[in-house]
Amino acid sequence: STKNGRDSNSKRLGVKVYGNQPAKAGSIIVRQRGLTFKPGKGVSVGKDYTIFATQNGIVQFESDKKEKIISVY
């Protein structure tokens, strides 16, 4: 028998709502490990670094020199 053959379940991370798409309050925009995307206006961060909308609006991805910021307007 082999000692290999194990793998963890995928965690389904990544962007769930893309730029210029509508988001309702409470809807998840990004699932991430660590703050790859930083929160802007109209969004908040959960304890597992999930970024979610706090208001209804359109998702906008903005980038400074280093930071990627997500906002909902």
From Swiss-Prot:
Belongs to the bacterial ribosomal protein bL27 family. This is Large ribosomal subunit protein bL27c. It is found in: Plastid, Chloroplast. One of its GO terms (biological process) is translation. One of its GO terms (molecular function) is structural constituent of ribosome. PROSITE patterns: RIBOSOMAL_L27. Keywords: Chloroplast, Plastid, Ribonucleoprotein, Ribosomal protein. PANTHER family: LARGE RIBOSOMAL SUBUNIT PROTEIN BL27M, RIBOSOMAL PROTEIN L27. SUPFAM superfamilies: Ribosomal L27 protein-like. It comes from Chrysochromulina alifera. Its main location: plastid. It comes from the Eukaryota. InterPro entries: Ribosomal_bL27, Ribosomal_bL27_CS. One of its GO terms (cellular component) is ribosome. The lineage of its organism: Eukaryota, Haptista, Haptophyta, Prymnesiophyceae, Prymnesiales.
